[in-house]
Amino acid sequence: MNFPEIYSATGMMELIQKIGFLPLLDSGIEGFSAEDIVAEDCGYVRLPEGGWDWPLWKWKGEIVQEMPCMYGKFFNKKAGFISQEWWPDFCNYRRSKFPRPDEESIEGAILSTLQSTGSLITRELRTACGFTGKGMRSKFDGYLTRLEMATYIVTEDFIYPRDKHNREYGWGWSLLNTPEELYGRDACKCERTPEESYQRIFEHLKVILPDASDKQIIKLIG
């Protein structure tokens, strides 16, 4: 499938709705990422006066808030979008591979903390879970990535600090939540078996990515 060149967040939302799955950056499949299909002037650029501009990066919050859709590290530990239509099958398959963590485990404690407090930005959740010492940030991020890959945690929005002129700056922080809290338990329910969900996703990706090998698609599904 030849993807149209995208010039706006609205155009990106329409594409995600149409194809169901879209990694943000390099997916390992040539041409299959939001970064690959945006117009050249929507890509990352360093500004002469310092700083940077990257329209695609700024669209993420608008996309997850307005579609809505799921966003998180779903594709080989890399971030991307999944439409609500395809989320139940994806969730069904992934959770069959990664059952809900035991509450006594570190992942279970992180998930329980988020469920009890409601949405938190990453650093707030990290502090609430006691990952405050030296080297704890990278360890916490590893646990968080596993929970996102297993579809238990998603990004609700992106929060940016503001300068003295009340302008947003920086890369922003992910506001984390559970998909059930965001959209209700029915959003994750699927009537198919995990095997049926996997096959449905595989066949769909074969249609939209005709030049990708089976190995590449299998790796993408996880």
Spans of model-derived segments:
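Long, low-complexity intrinsically disordered regions
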Residues: M1-G222
